[in-house]
Amino acid sequence: MKPDVNVLLAAARGDHPQHEVARTWLEGALVAAASGASFTLMPMVVASFLRLATSPRIFQVPTPIDVAVGFIDSLVASAGVTMATLGPEWLLLRRLCVDKRLGGNDLPDAWLAAATLHLGEHLVSFDRNFVKLLGRAQFTRLSSATA
């Protein structure tokens, strides 16, 4: 499994409306990773998490950078958690962009979907847009407790 940025943000911030759902999923995924299940952090997701969590445009009280980095560090230090090495996913990203006629704000999701396909992983997100990029075998959409 690999979490999308919205899952990490919700899990990390107690004031997030989807905190409980995300935190419960994350805790379960970390237990599973310690028992041998896949849990992969994507570099683009980590960078987006740091950018969004620390932004005063996103949160009235942004997460201090040392706290945000500490959250990621704690995940990386957890048993069974890995950080992906990327690069060869370009051909899949290219194909998704051309076949699905993607551009603009679709590109970060397309890059994450391409990396998910390349690595043979499974993505978890609150974002419904991944349905058009990944099949059921590669994607789980978490439901919000507030939705």
PLM regions and their residue ranges:
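Short, flexible helix/strand-to-coil boundary loops that buttress conserved ligand/catalytic motifs
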Residues: A12, A53, L134-A137
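Short, well-structured N-terminal submotif of metal-dependent ribonuclease cores
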Residues: M1-L41, P56-G70, T146-A147
